[in-house]
Amino acid sequence: VLYKNEVLLCARNKKIDARFLLGLMKQESSFRSNAKSPAGARGLLQLTYDTALKYSTAAGYPNLQPEDLYRTDINIAIACIYIAELLKKFDGFYEAVAASYNGGEDNAERWLKRTNPNDKGVFVAEIGFPETKNYVLKVMVNYQIYRQLYDENLKSYSNRMQEKSR
């Protein structure tokens, strides 16, 4: 698993499923730390400088510069604080977190309000931006694949099976 130590550290500290972080990272940058979007988002988790500045001091980087977002440790640490805030805001609902991460918090809140609280499976259908809807579906598929491959400590299920058979 690429960036396993950084992902696990952040996931444990912020109570985020590490496999969700991997799913988000795969979709955002295909695990390329040097990725840069046309909108200027940078690094593994494609943070914009403005968003990163909101969380940089809490992450221990009060003098953050835009180029720092290409450093995997910094990018993951800042994104984790942001994602943890979104998880709290959306009551642990990962689909809404992904929608917010891509389409904005206000939009995700609006889409969630149109969803029956007892039927959150309908949430993705309520997403008003085709790009964000597609993004959420891809992130959640990535997340489910990582849940099939790894436990919460990112240990491969197949490796554990091999160890047990020895």
Where are these regions (language model features)?
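Catalytic glycan-binding domains that act on GlcNAc-containing polysaccharides
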Residues: 1-166
